[in-house]
C-alpha cells in the first residue's frame, strides 16, 4: 500500500526535488542575462542584493538571481559551471536541510550558493569543516569567488592571535572546524572585556561532513579545563593492582554460581565490573601496598576515591590498548580518533582515565584537569538560527538528524549515473585466512594496473597489513594518523595505475581520488615556479594534462578504483563512506568487504549465527562464505549497534539539556554583567537580599523578641561584612522597635558603608571593580558547579534501584545545585565588596587588570565519559522538543527550568 502511494504521489524526497527543480529552471532562465554583465556589474550585484534585502526583500525571493550570479562568478573565477544538481543541493542547504551528495559531486562548490545568499544578510555565515587543513584550503579556494563578488572571508584556526580571530568572525563568511567554533563560544563566555569576545550572534552554519560532526562526535563534549589536585603517586601505585587481580572467563549469569575470578569486562558498554570475591581481593592488595589501612573497607566514605582510582586503572588495563585507542609519542599518550584514525593531539580522557593509561605505559603523568567550561556539539549547533549540512552518507542516520536536530535529509541525485559494483561480503573463519584473501585481491589488482584503496579500522590493523604487503614485495602507501602531514599528497596519488593505499577509516575525506592521479598538485607547483614565464607554465601544464589522459583511460580499463574493506564498522554509514571513494562522477569502480569471525563486530554481535551457518555448510579451511543471507545478518548486527548508539546519544542529550539550560541562563546573565554600563543596581539588589537573608537567620519573620538572637546577628555582621552596629543598645533605647524597622536600619548601614567606599575611589573605577568581582565569582562557582554536575551524573543511575526515575532525579538535584550556586555567587560578591579595603582608584584598577589577564592556561579538548550516567537507565525516553534559540524571559514569567517559580525568584536572581 505504501509503495503504491509512493508511486502515485512520490516520496517526500521526490516532492522536495520537484519543488526545487522549478527554482532551478528559474535560475537557468536568468543565465543569458547575467552572463552579459561585465565583471564590475556582476560584482556590484552584491551591494544591490544587500540594499534590496534591507528594504524588505527576503533571501528566498533573492535566491534565483543570487544563485545565477554565483554560477556566473564560478565560470569566470574557476572555469567551473555549477551543475543543476549542485543548484538543487544549494537550495536544500538554504532551506536548512542536509544535502546528501555522493563523493566527487562537488559539495565544496555547491556550498558557495547558500553561503553567498545568506551572507547578504550581513550577519555572518560559518562554514564548518572537519580539520584545519580543509578549513584553510576551502577559505583560500572559495575565497577567490567571494572576493570577486565583493565579500570578505576569514578562517579561524587554533593558536590564532585574538585580533585575527575577531577580524575573521567579523568577515561575511568564516571557515573553521567544529572544535574551534565551539571553543571560541566557550572562550567568549570566559572573557572579562566586551572587546575581547570573538563571535557575533550565531546566525547560519553549513556543516561539511555533517554526519561525522553531528553524529560521530555528538558524545564528545568540548571541554576547557585547568589543572586540579596532583594524584601522580596514587596513579603509579594503583597501576600495580590490576595485574594482581584475576579476570573471569565469562560474565556472571543470574541464578548461577559466580565464575572464578575478581572482575569481568563488558565490551559492549566499555565497563569493568568487580565480583564479591574481587572486592575482597582488592582490599587485601590495597592494604598490602599501603593504600588502605588494615581492617578498613573500600566503601568507607573516606576511601571512595580509592575505589574510583582502582576501577579507572582496571579500565586502562582491560579496555584501552596501545596502537588501537591511543599511541605513545614523544613520551605522551595521544588519543586516536575511533572514527577517522587521526591523532587527537591535545585531547585527554577525563575522570583520571588518561593518567591511568599514562601510568600503565610508564610515561610522565600529567595533572588531572578541572572543567572550566564545556558544551556538546549537539547543544552548540542547535544555537544557530539556521543550520544545514552536507555529506555523502546521511540517509542511514536521517531519523537521528530529524529527531535530535530537526534537520531533514534530502538525497540529491548524481550528475552522472553511478556504475560502481558493490560485491557481497566474504566471511572467513579466522583473521589469518581473511588477510590472505585480501593480499591475493590486492596482488591481482596491482598486476592488472588497478589502483586499490584498503580501509582499516585502526592504526594497528593498517600497520599489520602494511607488514604483509612488504613481505609480499608490493609497493604501497599507508595513510593513518602517523602520516597525517602527507595526507593530501597520498590521497592525490591514490588513483594512479596499480597504486596501493592503506587508510584508517575515513582519513583523507575532503580530497577526491582522481583516476590516473591528480594533476592539480603538480599544476600548483608549476604556478609557484617564478623562473618560468606564463607561456612556459601553460605549455608544461598542457603537457601534464596530455600525459594524464592515457593514465586515466588505463585505470578505467582496469576497472576503476578498487575499494577493499578489512572489517565492517559498527555503522553502515562509515562502510558507505569507504565505498563512496570509488565511482565518483560516473567513473567505474568496485568494492568488497572481507570479514572473519574474529572481528570485533562479528564476535560481539553476529558471530554465533554466522559460525553455525559455516559449520552446517562444512566449509574447508580458507574457503569463505559469500551469501546475501550472511550480509543481511551483518547489517542486522550493525543496525543493532546503530540503534544502541542512537539511544545513548539521545539519553546523553536529555541529561545535557539540563546543564545546557543552566548554561544559557548563566552565560546570558554573565553577558549582561559584561555589557552593562553599570551594575550598581544589580549589586545593590544582591546586597539587600543577602543582608535580609542573614538577618532572618537570627531574627525570623513573625517571631517574638524572646526568639531573637541579636548578639549573634551583631557578631555575624561584624565578622562577615565588617558592619559594626550596636543592635542590642538600639533595642534597649527603643523597646518598641519592630523586626522590619531593625532590618531597615541594618540595610541602611550596609548601604552607607558601601557608598563611602564608592566615594573613596570614584564611581567609575568602582563600577569596573564591581564588574570584575562579579565575573570572577560567576566563573569560579560555575566551575565548581560543573564538577558537581559531573559527580551527580556519574552516580545518578543508582537511583533506579530505589524505584526512582534517574532523569527526573538528575533534573531535580541539578536544579537544587544551580539554586545553591546562585546563592553562593550572591554571598561571595557581597562579602568581597563589603569587606575589601581600598585606599585609592589605582588599587582598584590594578585588581581589574589582574582579573582581565588570561586566566585559563593550556586549553585542552578531551573526551568525558558520560556512559556511566546512562548505565542501567531503562528504555529510551521520548524525544524532547528542540529549541533553536532561548527566548528572552520576562522577570514575572515562569522560569524556563521548570521549577514553577517566577524567573526573578529563580534563575533570574542575577539578572
From Swiss-Prot:
Its EC number is 7.4.2.8. GO terms for cellular component: cell envelope Sec protein transport complex; cytosol; plasma membrane. Keywords: ATP-binding, Cell inner membrane, Cell membrane, Cytoplasm, Membrane, Metal-binding, Nucleotide-binding, Protein transport, Translocase, Translocation, Transport, Zinc. It is a peripheral membrane protein. Zn(2+) binds at residues 895, 897, 906-907. InterPro entries: Helicase_ATP-bd, Helicase_C-like, P-loop_NTPase, SEC_C_motif, SecA, SecA_CS, SecA_DEAD, SecA_motor_DEAD. The keyword Cytoplasm applies. May bind 1 zinc ion per subunit. It is found in: Cell inner membrane; Cytoplasm. This is Protein translocase subunit SecA.
Amino acid at each position: 500500500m505504501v509503495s503504491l502511494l509512493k508511486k502515485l504521489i512520490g516520496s517526500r524526497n521526490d516532492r522536495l526535488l520537484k519543488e526545487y527543480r522549478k527554482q532551478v529552471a528559474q535560475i537557468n532562465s536568468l543565465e543569458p542575462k547575467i552572463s552579459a554583465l561585465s565583471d564590475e556589474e556582476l560584482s556590484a550585484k552584491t551591494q544591490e542584493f544587500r540594499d534590496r534585502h534591507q528594504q524588505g526583500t527576503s533571501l528566498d525571493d533573492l535566491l534565483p538571481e543570487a544563485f545565477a550570479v554565483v554560477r556566473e562568478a564560478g565560470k569566470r573565477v574557476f572555469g567551473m559551471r555549477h551543475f543543476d544538481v549542485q543548484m538543487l543541493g544549494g537550495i536544500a542547504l538554504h532551506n536548512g536541510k542536509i544535502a546528501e551528495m555522493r563523493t566527487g559531486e562537488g559539495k565544496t562548490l555547491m556550498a558557495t550558493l547558500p553561503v553567498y545568499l545568506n551572507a547578504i544578510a550581513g550577519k555572518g555565515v560559518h562554514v564548518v569543516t572537519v580539520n584545519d587543513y580543509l578549513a584553510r584550503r576551502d577559505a583560500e579556494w572559495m575565497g577567490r569567488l567571494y572576493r570577486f563578488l565583493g565579500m570578505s572571508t576569514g578562517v579561524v584556526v587554533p593558536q590564532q592571535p585574538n585580533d585575527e580571530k575577531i577580524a575573521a568572525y567579523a568577515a561575511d563568511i568564516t571557515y573553521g572546524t567544529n572544535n574551534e567554533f565551539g571553543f571560541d563560544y566557550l572562550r567568549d563566555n570566559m572573557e572579562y572585556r566586551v572587546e575581547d569576545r570573538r563571535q557575533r550572534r550565531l546566525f547560519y552554519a553549513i556543516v561539511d561532513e555533517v554526519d561525522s560532526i553531528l553524529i560521530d562526535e555528538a558524545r564528545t563534549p568540548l571541554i576547557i579545563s585547568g589543572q586540579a589536585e596532583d594524584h601522580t603517586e596514587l596513579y603509579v601505585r594503583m597501576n600495580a593492582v590490576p595485574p594482581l587481580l584475576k579476570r573471569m572467563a565469562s560474565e556472571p549469569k543470574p541464578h548461577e554460581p559466580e565464575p572464578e575470578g575478581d572482575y569481568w569486562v563488558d565490551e559492549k558498554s566499555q565497563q569493568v565490573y568487580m565480583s564479591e570475591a574481587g572486592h575482597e581481593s582488592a582490599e587485601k592488595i590495597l592494604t598490602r601496598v599501603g593504600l588502605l589501612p588494615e581492617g578498613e573497607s573500600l566503601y568507607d566514605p573516606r576511601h571512595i576515591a580509592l575505589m574510583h582510582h582502582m576501577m579507572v586503572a582496571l579500565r586502562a588495563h582491560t579496555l584501552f590498548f596501545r596502537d588501537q585507542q591511543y599511541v605513545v609519542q614523544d613520551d605522551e599518550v595521544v588519543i586516536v580518533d575511533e572514527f577517522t584514525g587521526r591523532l587527537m593531539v591535545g585531547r585527554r580522557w577525563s575522570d583520571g582515565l588518561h593518567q591511568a593509561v599514562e601510568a600503565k605505559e610508564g610515561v610522565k603523568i600529567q595533572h588531572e584537569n578541572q572543567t572550566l567550561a564545556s558544551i556538546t556539539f549537539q547543544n552548540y549547533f542547535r544555537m544557530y538560527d539556521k543550520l544545514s549540512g552536507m555529506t555523502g552518507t546521511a540517509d542511514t542516520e536521517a531519523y537521528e538528524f530529524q529527531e535530535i536536530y530537526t534537520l531533514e535529509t534530502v538525497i540529491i541525485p548524481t550528475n552522472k549515473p553511478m556504475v560502481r559494483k558493490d560485491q557481497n561480503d566474504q566471511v572467513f573463519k579466522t583473521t589469518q585466512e581473511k588477510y590472505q584473501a585480501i593480499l591475493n585481491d590486492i596482488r591481482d589488482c596491482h598486476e592488472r594496473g588497478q589502483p586499490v584503496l584498503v580501509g582499516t579500522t585502526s592504526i594497528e590493523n593498517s600497520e599489520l597489513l602494511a607488514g604483509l604487503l612488504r613481505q609480499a614485495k608490493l609497493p604501497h602507501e599507508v595513510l593513518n594518523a602517523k602520516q597525517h602531514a602527507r595526507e593530501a599528497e597520498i590521497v592525490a596519488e591514490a588513483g594512479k595505475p596499480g597504486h596501493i593505499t592503506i587508510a584508517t577509516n575515513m582519513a583523507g575525506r575532503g580530497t577526491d581520488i582522481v583516476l590516473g592521479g591528480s594533476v592539480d598538485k603538480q599544476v600548483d607547483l608549476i604556478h609557484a615556479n617564478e623562473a618560468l614565464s606564463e607561456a612556459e607554465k601553460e605549455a608544461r601544464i598542457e603537457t601534464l594534462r596530455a600525459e594524464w589522459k592515457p593514465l586515466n583511460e588505463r585505470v578505467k580499463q582496469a576497472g576503476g578504483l578498487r575499494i577493499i574493506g578489512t572489517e565492517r564498522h559498527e555503522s553502515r554509514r562509515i562502510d558507505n563512506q569507504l565505498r563512496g571513494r570509488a565511482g565518483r562522477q560516473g567513473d567505474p569502480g568496485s568494492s568488497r568487504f572481507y570479514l572473519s569471525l574474529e572481528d570485533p563486530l562479528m564476535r560481539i554481535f553476529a558471530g554465533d549465527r554466522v559460525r553455525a551457518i559455516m559449520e552446517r555448510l562444512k566449509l574447508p579451511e580458507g574457503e569463505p562464505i559469500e551469501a546475501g543471507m550472511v550480509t543481511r545478518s551483518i547489517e542486522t548486527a550493525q543496525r543493532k549497534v546503530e540503534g544502541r548508539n542512537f539511544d545513548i546519544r539521545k539519553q546523553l542529550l536529555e541529561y545535557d539539556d539540563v546543564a545546557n539550560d543552566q548554561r544559557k541562563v548563566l552565560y546570558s546573565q554573565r553577558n549582561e554583567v559584561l555589557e552593562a554600563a553599570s551594575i550598581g543596581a544589580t549589586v545593590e539588589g544582591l546586597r539587600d537580599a543577602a543582608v535580609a537573608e542573614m538577618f532572618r537567620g537570627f531574627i525570623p519573620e513573625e517571631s517574638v523578641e524572646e526568639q531573637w538572637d541579636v548578639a549573634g546577628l551583631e557578631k555575624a555582621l561584624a565578622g562577615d561584612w565588617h558592619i559594626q552596629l550596636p543592635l542590642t543598645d538600639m533595642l534597649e533605647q527603643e523597646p518598641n522597635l519592630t523586626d522590619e524597622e531593625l532590618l531597615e536600619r541594618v540595610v541602611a548601614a550596609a548601604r552607607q558603608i558601601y557608598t563611602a567606599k564608592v566615594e573613596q575611589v570614584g564611581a567609575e573605577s568602582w563600577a569596573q571593580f564591581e564588574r570584575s568581582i562579579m565575573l570572577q565569582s560567576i566563573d569560579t562557582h560555575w566551575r565548581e558547579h560543573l564538577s558537581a554536575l559531573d559527580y551527580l551524573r556519574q552516580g545518578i543511575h543508582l537511583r533506579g534501584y530505589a524505584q526512582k526515575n534517574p532523569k527526573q532525579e538528575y533534573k531535580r538535584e541539578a536544579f537544587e545545585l544551580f539554586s545553591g550556586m546562585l546563592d553562593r555567587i550572591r554571598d561571595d560578591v557581597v562579602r568581597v565588596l563589603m569587606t575589601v579595603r581600598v585606599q585609592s582608584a589605582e588599587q582598584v584598577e590594578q585588581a581589574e587588570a589582574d582579573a582581565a589577564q588570561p586566566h585559563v592556561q593550556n586549553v585542552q579538548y578531551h573526551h568525558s565519559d558520560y556512559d556511566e550516567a546512562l548505565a542501567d537507565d531503562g528504555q529510551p525516553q521520548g524525544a524532547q522538543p528542540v529549541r533553536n534559540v532561548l527566548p528572552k524571559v520576562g522577570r514575572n514569567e515562569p522560569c524556563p527550568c521548570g521549577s514553577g517559580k517566577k524567573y526573578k525568584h529563580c534563575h533570574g536572581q542575577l539578572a
